[in-house]
């Protein structure tokens, strides 16, 4: 309530004190002065509200008659606050408490009322209502929020400054109670409030109106796009909707947050009663919700400060929120809160890029075809809040296939400017793993890759824009072509070329400048492409997807602009295209991990490139997708999945690398000699291994960044792989040619140095592979953890040519679910080491068990009846037999003294000497044992423990 202290306030204060100091008896309560009556009615109002709505209504009716009186009391109360010393005020509080006790209310209620007042605004049950009332009060002036009266009351605040000696509790008990209860009054009370507000000076009114208008405009702009978010409803409510427009809880949070905001925003003193109350509590209790809302309200402060810039951000953010609602309604609120918080924070850090959590459910395969132009514009708008991107762009972003949305990493400010220049910059920059694993957006790669519009700066910048060439990954049912065009910063961009694979002619290959220096890895996925899980850097292709991305066989050195022609076998065109690939920026891999923007990422690419990227349906992301993420891959059209065998070529190492976020750096360490890649690629071998190897290599590097966003299932896979690795020698995985199960022997081969057919002798990269493999092991990543899900499709018909034997099918992810159903694959994987698919391995164990059982049945022990029938049980007697006598004689003849042992027999099972009268059993072979000992043996094995003669072979002679 905004009441102005009148000139006769001191008199009223004295009168009021008199009333408080000379309370009448309870019996005379009806004759109380109007002021006291008003207090009583107010208290009853509040308590009744706490008790029940009906009581509240009744109390409201009772209090109608005393509106004017209440206004007087409020004036007096305010005055007393102004002039009274802390002692006088505390006295007043005591008297006031006594008055309240006169009411037929229990002390308990009294305490509760005071606690309500004292408690922080958020905890007060009426606080929200108070705000609601204030908003209603402000309704005449279309001011947007309760704060709106930042309340130009600086003059008023100065009129009655609160003495510092004033105790917080006294203030809270005095004014807040009035405030709360008065605000609880029915709407008709608003007239009174309005009348009071009319007393404001003209200057104050003008100031308030300006602020209100400003806030209203900004609030409308800000929340126009948020139809039903609680935050929008809150602000809308404060701006123009009546309190009923939003739930009381919302009001409560908003009002608390906004009031506090006002307190902070207008320290000069324009403080409203609400603000004062909040201030009074030095450490207001803030609920979690309130904190969140405070943060969100900070955005309101930001609006005032930032002005229109905020709008572009808000517009962008809201579409994202809507999109979030569509893709995962469960998280929409959470996302919205996050977005708003990030917005608030950003102005402080001058980071133009918003932290956007565009995480998409992996399970959601839906992909919205979007023209690359739209996609590009979106990322740009997101990247730089400065760019006033049109809302359509943001909408397109929200429209982006729910399944894949790139996460926009924070982009260094220097690059941002460039990005802003070209609104069409590819989303490659956006792809960097800035935050939680987010599904990368599927840009429509072919249709129109906007040329690299960014200023040459970006290319010249120290950081190569690996994504300068928009990587194009075409998710064709059978092959993903990832065209990664990355121009080395210094290296001239390779000329744009048509991608025959692309259904739509690609515009100049020049990739939009990806402002992100090291993290610039953008992947364009064909709109029709299957859902892509860029977060894993893997394109999740359903069905047989050959991942052939030819990566430039550029030595790791980012500087090397060596161009290697890659033969891309296009499944669609079936013609192999030779692409000249510029050296790709080293940052291509680093992109995933901003920290390691070093070119090293590119280095690793070839290491496993030798293996053709597998058409991994789900996990190719690691091996093949990486390049998509790293975008650094050269543009060469991805070879269409050549014959299944080629697809079969699995970069065993690659997958495991992907799991390691840090692997990028590790990969960089051993730059595989590009020469072999080139050689492999150079010969358009049907094997396509060359291309696949290349693609794999870059995949590998890319995979490393990908690892950052491993999904839960991937994590599980990795854990499983690690477990298997510990249990079994990891090296075995690659060595065995799948086709020969007998080679399953764990020690067959020595590791990745697989026995490669001569054709693969070009395997020089195996050295790098080993290093990568070792690195992976060190990092605790199993070799291809997820790597090659896709290969199953091809493997199904795959008859591995000898040259492919070196492929470590074992490198395939253990978890690849698709492969479980393919018996061929199981057969092949049967030769793999522990890293091989769990299912195949499990099957092997089962088979072994069954075989053992079958064999065991043959060797199974004899039944007790057979034992009794075929053996001779008796009591042992130390009667030397003729045989013994002869033996002793023979010994003596030899001049050897017969020792006592010569005459004693031992049970060879228990190794104890047979004693007279012991139960013994003689087997058909005439060997003698304790019955107990030999029976146990024969139950499991029918053969004599000494001579291995089956007891069934001959009947006992002594029976």
Curated annotation (Swiss-Prot):
A motif (SUMO interaction motif 1 (SIM)) lies at residues 275-279. It is found in: Nucleus; Cytoplasm; Nucleus, PML body. It is an enzyme of class 2 (transferase). Residues 112-131, 228-246 have a biased composition (Low complexity). One of its GO terms (molecular function) is SMAD binding. Gene3D superfamilies: Zinc/RING finger domain, C3HC4 (zinc finger). Residues 633-646 have a biased composition (Pro residues). GO terms for biological process: DNA repair; positive regulation of transforming growth factor beta receptor signaling pathway; protein ubiquitination; ubiquitin-dependent protein catabolic process. Residues 51-66, 142-156, 256-267, 323-332, 370-397, 620-632 have a biased composition (Polar residues). Its EC number is 2.3.2.27. Keywords: Cytoplasm, Developmental protein, DNA damage, DNA repair, Isopeptide bond, Metal-binding, Nucleus, Transferase, Ubl conjugation pathway, Zinc, Zinc-finger. It comes from the Eukaryota. Residues 872-874, 922-926 are annotated as: Ubiquitin binding. Pfam families: RNF111_N, zf-RING_2. A motif (SUMO interaction motif 2 (SIM)) lies at residues 300-306. It catalyses: S-ubiquitinyl-[E2 ubiquitin-conjugating enzyme]-L-cysteine + [acceptor protein]-L-lysine = [E2 ubiquitin-conjugating enzyme]-L-cysteine + N(6)-ubiquitinyl-[acceptor protein]-L-lysine. E3 ubiquitin-protein ligase required for mesoderm patterning during embryonic development. Acts as an enhancer of the transcriptional responses of the smad2/smad3 effectors, which are activated downstream of BMP. Acts by mediating ubiquitination and degradation of SMAD inhibitors such as smad7, inducing their proteasomal degradation and thereby enhancing the transcriptional activity of TGF-beta and BMP. Specifically binds polysumoylated chains via SUMO interaction motifs (SIMs) and mediates ubiquitination of sumoylated substrates. This is E3 ubiquitin-protein ligase arkadia-B. The lineage of its organism: Eukaryota, Metazoa, Chordata, Craniata, Vertebrata.
């Amino acid at each position: 309530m905004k009441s102005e202290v009148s000139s006769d306030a001191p008199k009223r204060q004295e009168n009021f004190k008199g009333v408080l100091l000379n309370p009448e008896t309870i019996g005379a309560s009806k004759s109380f002065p109007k002021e006291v009556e008003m207090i009583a009615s107010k208290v009853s109002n509040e308590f009744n509200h706490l008790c029940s709505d009906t009581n509240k209504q009744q109390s409201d009716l009772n209090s109608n008659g005393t509106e004017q009186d209440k206004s007087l009391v409020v004036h007096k109360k305010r005055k007393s606050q102004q002039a009274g010393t802390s002692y006088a005020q505390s006295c007043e509080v005591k008297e006031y408490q006594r008055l309240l006790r006169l009411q037929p209310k229990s002390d308990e209620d009294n305490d509760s009322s005071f606690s309500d007042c004292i408690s922080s605004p958020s905890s007060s049950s009426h606080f929200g209502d108070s705000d609601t009332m204030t908003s209603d009060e402000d309704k005449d002036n279309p001011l947007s929020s309760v704060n709106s009266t930042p309340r130009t009351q600086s003059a008023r605040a100065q009129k009655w400054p609160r003495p510092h000696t004033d105790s917080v509790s006294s203030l809270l008990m005095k004014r807040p109670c009035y405030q709360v209860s008065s605000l609880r009054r029915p709407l008709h009370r608003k007239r009174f409030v309005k009348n009071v507000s009319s007393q404001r000076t003209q200057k104050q009114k003008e100031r308030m109106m300006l602020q209100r208008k400003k806030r209203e405009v900004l609030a409308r702009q800000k929340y126009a796009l948020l139809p039903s978010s609680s935050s929008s409803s809150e602000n809308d409510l404060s701006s123009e909707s009546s309190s009923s427009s939003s739930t009381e809880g919302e009001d409560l949070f908003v009002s608390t947050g906004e009031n506090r905001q006002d307190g902070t925003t207008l320290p000069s003193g324009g403080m409203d009663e609400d603000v004062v109350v909040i201030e009074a509590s030095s450490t207001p209790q803030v609920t979690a919700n309130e904190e969140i809302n405070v943060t969100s309200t900070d955005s309101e402060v930001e609006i005032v400060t930032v002005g229109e810039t905020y709008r572009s951000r808000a517009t962008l953010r809201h579409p994202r929120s809507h999109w979030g609602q569509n893709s995962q309604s469960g998280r929409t609120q959470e996302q919205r809160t996050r977005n708003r918080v990030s917005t608030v924070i950003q102005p402080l850090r001058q980071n133009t890029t918003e932290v956007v959590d565009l995480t998409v459910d992996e399970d959601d395969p839906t992909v919205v075809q979007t023209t690359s132009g739209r996609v590009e514009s979106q990322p740009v708008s997101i990247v730089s809040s400065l760019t006033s991107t049109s809302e359509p762009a943001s909408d397109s972003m929200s429209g982006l296939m729910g399944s894949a949305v790139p996460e926009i990493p924070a982009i260094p400010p220097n690059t941002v400017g460039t990005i802003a220049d070209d609104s069409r910059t590819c989303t490659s920059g956006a792809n960097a793993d800035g935050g939680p694993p987010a599904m990368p957006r599927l840009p429509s790669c072919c249709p129109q890759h906007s040329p690299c519009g960014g200023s040459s700066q970006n290319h010249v910048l120290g950081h190569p824009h690996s994504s300068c060439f928009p990587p194009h990954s075409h998710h064709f049912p059978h092959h993903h072509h990832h065209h990664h065009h990355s121009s080395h910063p210094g290296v001239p961009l390779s000329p744009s070329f048509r991608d025959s694979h692309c259904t739509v002619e690609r515009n100049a290959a020049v990739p939009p400048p990806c402002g992100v220096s090291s993290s610039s890895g953008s992947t364009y996925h064909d709109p029709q492409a299957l859902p892509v899980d860029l977060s894993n850097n893997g394109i999740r292709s359903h069905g047989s997807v050959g991942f052939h991305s030819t990566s430039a066989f550029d030595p790791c050195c980012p500087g090397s602009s060596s161009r290697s022609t890659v033969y891309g076998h296009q499944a669609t065109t079936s013609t192999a295209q030779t692409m000249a690939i510029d050296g790709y920026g080293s940052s291509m891999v680093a992109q995933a991990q901003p920290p390691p923007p070093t070119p090293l990422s590119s280095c690793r690419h070839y290491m496993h490139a030798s293996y053709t990227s597998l058409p991994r349906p789900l996990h190719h992301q690691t091996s093949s997708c990486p390049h998509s993420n790293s975008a650094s891959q050269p543009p060469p059209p991805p070879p269409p999945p050549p014959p299944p065998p080629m697809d079969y070529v699995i970069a065993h190492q690659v997958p495991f690398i992907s799991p390691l976020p840090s692997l990028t750096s590790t990969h960089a360490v051993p730059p595989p000699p590009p020469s072999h890649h080139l050689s492999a690629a150079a010969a358009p071998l049907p094997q396509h291994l060359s291309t696949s190897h290349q693609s794999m290599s870059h995949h590998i590097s890319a995979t490393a960044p990908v690892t950052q966003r491993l999904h839960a299932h991937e994590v599980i896979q990795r854990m499983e792989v690690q477990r298997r690795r510990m249990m079994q020698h990891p090296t075995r995985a690659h060595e065995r040619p799948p086709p020969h199960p007998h080679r399953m022997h764990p020690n067959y081969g020595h590791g990745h140095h697989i026995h490669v057919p001569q054709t693969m002798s070009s395997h020089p990269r195996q050295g790098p592979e080993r290093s990568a493999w070792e690195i992976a092991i060190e990092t605790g990543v199993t070799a291809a953890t997820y790597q090659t899900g896709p290969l199953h499709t091809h493997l199904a018909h795959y008859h591995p040519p000898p040259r492919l034997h070196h492929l470590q099918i074992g490198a395939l992810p253990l978890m690849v679910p698709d492969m479980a159903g393919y018996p061929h694959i199981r057969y092949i994987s049967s030769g793999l080491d522990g890293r091989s698919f769990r299912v195949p391995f499990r099957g092997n164990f089962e088979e072994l068990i069954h075989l053992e059982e079958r064999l065991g049945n043959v060797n199974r022990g004899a039944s007790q009846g057979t034992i009794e029938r075929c053996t001779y049980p008796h009591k042992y007697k130390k009667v030397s037999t003729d045989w013994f006598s002869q033996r002793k004689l023979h010994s003596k003849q030899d001049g050897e003294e017969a020792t006592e042992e010569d005459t004693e027999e031992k049970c060879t099972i228990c190794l104890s000497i047979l004693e007279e009268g012991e139960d013994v059993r003689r087997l058909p072979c005439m060997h003698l044992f304790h019955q107990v000992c030999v029976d146990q043996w024969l139950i499991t094995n029918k053969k004599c423990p000494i001579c291995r003669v089956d007891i069934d072979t001959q009947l006992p002679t002594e029976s």
